[in-house]
Regions:
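Glycine/proline-enriched, intrinsically flexible loops and inter-domain linkers
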Residues: 1-129, 135-250
């Protein structure tokens, strides 16, 4: 994190979509470049290795399914999983009271000065469809607490997952009934080159709290309380044998 960043170019190297694994082989040049840009390459190597391993297992399991069922039946099953997710979400939405509900959550600094940053949500329930509209949210800020559109969608889905029936599957079909409106240039859909390293914490937490505030109005019995936001301790120092250690108290 660069807490004083005022544009994304202050936040480290930027990478387009690249293949770290190509034709089943690790790209050593890209791997070494990633590790070279980390203060804790041993931790990064472990994290990336775990993700690669889990992805390979997932690919193998999916291949096994297709091999056993055949392409046509396998694709039909995968489509059915997405459709089931959609039906489950529509059922949960239909159980909410139709109407328009609004709520806001706030952050109190743009990383340079004290200022209220509002994340405003207007939630519309109509039958088995849901619209979450961030119109009225504060404009993007100078500091690194801006959100890209993908992060905003993720925060909304996280809030819904916590509020609604936890047995609802989490897949692309699940979110077909959800329409998200996030004005370009706002703190929840910032224009380039806005800095946004912190976006998975702020404004993600503000987005979730605002969504919960609106959802609680249409079903108070399932209301989710907010929490202490980002109060995490970090310990760091030099290792006796060289290198740096970091302990993040999540």
């Amino acid at each position: 994190y660069n807490a004083k960043a005022t544009e994304i170019f202050h936040e480290g190297i930027r990478l387009p979509v690249l293949k770290l694994i190509e034709k089943g082989q690790l790209r050593d040049d890209l791997w070494r470049m990633l590790l070279l840009n980390s203060r804790c390459p041993d931790l990064l190597e472990g994290d990336l290795g775990a993700m690669i391993g889990s992805t390979r297992i997932g690919a193998q399991r999916l291949s096994d399914v297709i091999r056993n069922l055949g392409i046509e039946k396998g694709n039909a099953y995968l489509t059915a999983i997405l459709d089931y997710g959609e039906r489950s979400m529509r059922k949960a939405i239909a159980e909410l009271k139709d109407g328009v509900y609004s709520a806001s959550d706030f952050s109190d600094t743009d990383c340079f000065k004290l200022v209220d940053i509002e994340t405003r949500v207007t939630l519309t329930i109509q039958g088995d469809d849901m619209t979450i509209d961030f119109t009225g949210t504060s404009p993007q800020i100078r500091g690194f607490k801006n959100s890209g559109i993908a992060n905003t969608h993720s925060a909304v889905y996280c809030a819904l997952s916590a509020f609604l029936d936890p047995s609802i599957p989490k897949n692309e079909g699940t979110y077909r009934p959800i329409k998200i409106i996030a004005p370009l240039g706002s703190v929840v859909n910032a224009r380039a080159p806005a800095p946004m390293t912190m976006n998975t914490v702020f404004p993600a937490i503000d987005i979730m709290n605002a969504c919960w505030g609106a959802l609680a109005q249409c079903n108070p019995e399932r209301a989710c309380a907010g929490w202490g936001k980002s109060v995490f301790g970090i310990s760091s120092g030099n290792k006796p044998e060289g290198g740096v250690f970091v302990l993040y108290h999540w």
